[in-house]
């Protein structure tokens, strides 16, 4: 079936490639940094013929007669560019790309400065960042690694490719941060289709909101939200890449789109495959070889049960830019994952061998978007996803192993086996979690005029879950639980744009509804019949907030935002997940937080060939009923294989600041630096202390330089250098007030360095890149002190067809 799907995609693209596109001009309009400029004007002078670029900055002009023509491109706030092109018999399909430089114009006494999507998002008042993926798509970089370079964002990963990931925004992590794909909660897609596996080439841009989340996302997050915006597919293109590197890591992806100009019929498809042995070197207190007499010897060894594979794809058919829809798509998303498990929550003395997880998902999706729906100013968008997800936990190997990768030998010289018959002490299992999942995101907005806009949004997500286990009898399976979790989040927002666009205000309210239903078959009191023990919870909550910005001068913008945020417990926190060693907690309650951000943005200052932008944000969070691990010495032990999320008694407070600097010179040199410093405190054993397992001080820096016409005319060489710093932090509270020996719980200070280069060949359709990660092979640790891979090398080939 997988091979048939791949062949079908191949023939579809080959057929599309053969279409006749004679007499057609295509291309893109971007700023000098390569960021798309939507709705730029492209006109052929003398023909009274022109178009506007789409949301991705691409344009197409058809039926252009033979001969020479002058093409003029303009965009408010940017300089006008013109080029002469020629349509002739041997070259009827011409591609022309434009880069526009930012300018400041004065129209009737009003200063107008062009804004890209990135600038517009980051100056609305929210503590927000827009991350472009254009350069990262050409390199051997995962989407998570790209996020990790962003100010205030820290990726918490339990190992190498495919390992469990948590996203930390200003110190708040886990389910406190919501992740979306085009506004749909990513949890709907399951572990086999996540940011570990989705390559940057599938992504248009990433929006990061810290602390305060706008109403249109309808999110139940107290830490913030990350919204992955996929490419819309308004331009004929095909992109294929393959990357290979250390640890036998292979990553491939194929994505493309075809649009019939006359009918608007559009096809989008993408596919990916990732694999890694993840057999990197590790060391530490618990990494030991155990002799038959029980003597433990510290060793440096390789992980040996940590391979990862994921395969998936998405295909959509529909129409774009037609009279009845800006976008209409129906499609399918399919994914499959295999993930070996090396250890439990902590890196314990006894590693796992033979324990692995398998996941798959098959989901249908529908998208409809239309501006000026029925009446001018009324915009509508609806996205729906429905499908099935399965996860199998396979743990049937009883043999005990040491970190040397060999069998554990007993006093009698014979290999040992665990008495419980599996790697995990809970006993052998082939547990299956089957889920029916659904989510619908709908939104209406009405623009009264240039100053006032109202938005109404609703997000529904539901999970119907059924557990079973092939390793237990049919009778025992009748006692497996069934679980349902439903969420509704409704938001109403008002946007004000006043004083010649100097003041922007976004005020919103949110209403949250959650229903939990758990059915557990049990024997009645006299053990004569099986009855259903039902737990049901129906609760609703209300939150609200605002964001505001004021332009003091064209280069100084003040920003502030605040929200009373609610975070509803997630499915795994409520029902548990044996694959992640999580125990259920049916009575867990939502957590709440009062969040506030105050900051400013300076720039962009253009000083001849120099460009400088500086932004900073001060933030505070007051979290009550916090959901977390019982991270004190009595409630959480390193020997624990299972953990349970619970509501922690004491309030937590997060206060800190973040700052970011961008510098560019002559569009060739780019430098960025960001810093984030905070205190995240609570009370433990009567003493105020920092919340464990949370990095409090991080810095990132990046340097890029571009050589044009390197070796070959019209070629480009880009060099990249990045460095990452994380200060030491504890992953557990010390026992009581006595801090003697607490260094055992410290994750040490860490600095790592990456280097990369990409070479674009003259026709811009072939790119070769090379990356070195963790150049100096430093020991890097992360979530709960799990060590991450050392130095690694990767080579990537990209082939791009921008028009066919």
Q: Where are the regions that the model predicts?
A:
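N-terminal periplasmic accessory domains that precede
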Residues: 93-99, 143-146, 163-168, 180, ...
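Extracytoplasmic beta-strand/coil segments of soluble accessory domains associated
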Residues: 144-185
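Face-selective signature of the C-terminal outer-membrane beta-barrel domain
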Residues: 316-321, 325-336, 359-528, 539-545, ...
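C-terminal beta-signal and adjacent terminal beta-strands/loops
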Residues: 566, 619, 623-629, 719-740, ...
């Amino acid at each position: 079936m997988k091979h048939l799907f791949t062949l079908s995609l191949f023939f579809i693209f080959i057929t599309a490639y053969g279409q006749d596109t004679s007499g057609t001009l295509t291309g893109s309009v971007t700023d000098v940094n390569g960021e798309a400029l939507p709705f730029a004007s492209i006109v052929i002078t003398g023909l009274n013929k022109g178009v506007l670029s789409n949301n991705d900055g691409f344009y197409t002009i058809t039926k252009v007669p033979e001969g020479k023509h002058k093409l003029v491109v303009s965009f408010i706030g940017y300089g006008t560019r013109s080029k002469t092109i020629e349509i002739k018999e041997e070259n009827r399909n011409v591609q022309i790309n434009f880069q526009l430089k930012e300018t400041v114009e004065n129209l009737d006494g009003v200063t107008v400065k062009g804004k890209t999507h990135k600038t517009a998002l980051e100056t609305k008042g929210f503590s927000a960042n827009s991350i472009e993926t254009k350069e990262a798509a050409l390199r051997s970089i995962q989407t998570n690694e790209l996020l990790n370079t962003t100010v205030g964002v820290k990726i918490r990963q339990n190992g190498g490719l495919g390992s469990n990931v948590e996203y930390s925004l200003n110190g708040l992590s886990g389910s406190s941060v919501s992740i979306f794909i085009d506004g749909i909660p990513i949890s709907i897609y399951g572990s086999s289709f996540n940011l570990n596996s989705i390559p940057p080439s599938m992504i248009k841009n990433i929006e990061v909101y810290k602390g305060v989340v706008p109403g249109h996302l309808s999110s139940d997050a107290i830490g913030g939200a990350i919204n992955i915006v996929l490419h819309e597919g308004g331009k004929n293109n095909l992109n294929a890449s393959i990357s290979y590197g250390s640890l036998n890591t292979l990553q491939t992806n194929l994505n493309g789109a075809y649009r019939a100009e006359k009918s608007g019929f559009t096809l989008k498809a993408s596919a990916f495959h990732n694999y890694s042995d993840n057999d990197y070197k590790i060391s530490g207190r618990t990494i030991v070889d155990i002799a038959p007499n029980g003597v433990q010897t510290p060793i440096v060894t390789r992980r040996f049960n940590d391979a990862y594979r994921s395969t998936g794809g998405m295909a959509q058919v529909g129409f774009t830019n037609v009279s009845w829809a800006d976008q209409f798509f129906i499609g399918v998303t399919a994914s499959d994952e295999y993930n070996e498990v090396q250890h439990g929550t902590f890196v314990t003395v006894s590693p796992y061998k033979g324990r692995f997880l398998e996941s798959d998902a098959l989901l249908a999706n529908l998208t409809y978007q239309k501006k000026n729906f029925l009446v001018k100013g009324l915009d509508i968008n609806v996205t729906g996803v429905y499908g099935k997800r399965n996860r199998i936990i396979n743990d049937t190997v009883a043999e005990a192993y040491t970190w040397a990768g060999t069998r554990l030998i007993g006093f009698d010289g014979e290999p040992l086996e665990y008495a419980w018959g599996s790697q995990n002490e809970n006993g052998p299992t082939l547990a299956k979690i089957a889920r029916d999942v659904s989510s619908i995101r709908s939104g209406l907005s009405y623009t009264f005029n240039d100053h006032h806009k109202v938005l109404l949004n609703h997000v529904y997500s539901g999970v119907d879950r059924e557990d079973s286990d092939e390793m237990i009898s049919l009778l025992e399976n009748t006692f497996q639980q069934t679980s349902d979790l439903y969420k509704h989040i409704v938001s109403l927002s008002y946007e004000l744009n006043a004083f010649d666009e100097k003041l922007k205000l976004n005020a919103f309210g949110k209403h949250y509804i959650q229903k939990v239903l758990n059915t557990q078959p049990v024997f009645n009191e006299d053990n004569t019949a099986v009855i259903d023990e039902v737990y049901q919870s129906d609760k609703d909550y209300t939150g609200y907030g605002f964001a505001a910005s004021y332009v003091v001068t064209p280069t100084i913008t003040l920003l502030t935002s605040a929200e009373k945020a609610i975070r509803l417990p997630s499915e795994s926190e409520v029902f548990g997940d044996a694959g992640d060693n999580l125990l259920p907690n049916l009575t867990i309650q939502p957590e709440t937080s009062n969040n506030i951000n105050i900051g400013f943005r300076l720039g962009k200052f253009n000083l001849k060939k120099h460009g400088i932008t500086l932004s900073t944000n001060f933030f505070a969070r007051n979290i009550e009923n916090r959901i977390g691990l019982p991270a004190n010495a009595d409630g959480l032990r390193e020997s624990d294989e299972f953990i349970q999320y619970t509501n922690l008694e004491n309030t937590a407070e997060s206060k800190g600041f973040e700052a970011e600097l961008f510098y560019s010179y002559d569009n060739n040199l780019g430098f960025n630096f960001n810093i984030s410093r905070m205190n995240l405190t609570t009370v433990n054993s009567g003493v105020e202390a920092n919340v464990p397992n949370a990095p409090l001080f991080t810095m990132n820096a990046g340097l890029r330089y571009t050589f044009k016409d390197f070796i070959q005319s019209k070629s480009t060489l880009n060099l990249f250098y990045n460095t990452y710093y994380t200060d030491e932090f504890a992953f557990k509270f010390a026992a009581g007030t006595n801090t003697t020996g607490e260094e055992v719980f410290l994750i040490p200070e860490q600095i790592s360095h990456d280097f990369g280069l990409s070479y674009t060949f003259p026709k811009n359709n072939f790119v070769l890149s090379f990356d070195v990660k963790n150049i100096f092979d430093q020991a890097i640790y992360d979530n709960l002190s799990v060590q991450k891979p050392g130095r690694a090398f990767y080579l990537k080939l990209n082939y791009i067809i921008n028009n066919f």
